[in-house]
Curated annotation (Swiss-Prot):
Domain DHFR intervals: 4-184
BP GO terms, sorted: dihydrofolate metabolic process; folic acid metabolic process; one-carbon metabolic process; tetrahydrofolate biosynthetic process
Protein name: Viral dihydrofolate reductase
Record keywords: NADP, One-carbon metabolism, Oxidoreductase
E.C. number(s) listed in UniProt: 1.5.1.3
InterPro entries assigned: DHFR, DHFR-like_dom_sf, DHFR_CS, DHFR_dom
Sequence positions that bind substrate: 31-36, 70
Pathway recorded for this protein: Cofactor biosynthesis; tetrahydrofolate biosynthesis; 5,6,7,8-tetrahydrofolate from 7,8-dihydrofolate: step 1/1
Gene designation per UniProt: DHFR
Function noted in UniProt: Key enzyme in folate metabolism. Catalyzes an essential reaction for de novo glycine and purine synthesis, and for DNA precursor synthesis.
PROSITE patterns with a match to the protein in the record: DHFR_1, DHFR_2
One Pfam assignment: DHFR_1
């Protein structure tokens, strides 16, 4: 099964995403509503899975845990038991994605969202060839100690528009920001077989398209 992963994040001009486990900027209500809408919108009778590291989980105010109307999965190599309020615990992103194929989840999960922190974002960007990044671009700098990985435009394409994502610049509390969506570029390699067929192969996929040459 080829699984599409979605990372959603807000970054400042230096790709900073946090400071001491909290947002470096004041709460931006429209961005918060955007996060809620994107991560909860799902097809009927299914819910989205939100995957987060232990620190991200505990940075959420206890009264708001778990994130409602979503399946909450926490990643940790140290925790032995599922944190109170969470639904699942996995040691790694790879283990988490294997859980989705299990009977208890396979018919319940619609979309998969990675919501932090930095190392989990990095793992997702390295793991999947089918990946979208939903980036809230804060158009100023803040004091931060945690960063989002570099978005290499050799590997990612900035989409001109995307359904449900506002294209105009937002402003709240004197802070301007915009919503961006990036799609990971899947390279296709061509080679000719001895039978005279041209085969296009996409890395890490069991997908092959043949045509006569």
């Amino acid at each position: 099964m080829v699984l599409l992963l979605n990372c959603i994040v807000a970054v400042d001009q230096n790709m900073g995403i946090g400071k001491k486990g909290h947002l470096p900027w004041p709460l931006l209500i429209n961005d918060f509503k955007y996060f809620q809408r994107m991560t909860t919108s799902s097809v009927k009778n299914k819910q989205n899975l939100v995957i987060m590291g232990k620190n991200t989980w505990f940075s959420i105010p206890e009264k708001n845990r778990p994130l409602k109307d979503r399946i909450n999965l926490v990643l940790s190599k140290k925790l032995k038991e599922i944190p109170h309020g969470a639904h699942f615990l996995a040691r790694s992103l790879n283990d988490a994605l294997k859980l989705i194929e299990q009977p208890e989840l396979v018919n319940k999960v619609d979309r998969v969202w990675i919501i932090g922190g930095s190392s989990v974002y990095k793992d997702a960007m390295n793991y999947s060839s089918h990946l979208k990044l939903f980036v809230t671009r804060i158009m100023q700098s803040f004091e931060t100690d945690t960063f989002f990985p570099e978005i290499d435009l050799k590997n990612y394409k900035l989409l001109i528009e995307y359904p449900g994502v506002p294209s105009n610049t937002q402003e709240e509390k004197g802070i301007k920001y915009k919503f961006e969506v990036y799609e990971k570029i899947v390279n296709t390699f061509l080679f000719k077989s001895h039978a005279g067929l041209t085969c296009s192969v996409k890395p890490k996929e069991a997908s092959y398209d043949f045509e006569l040459s």
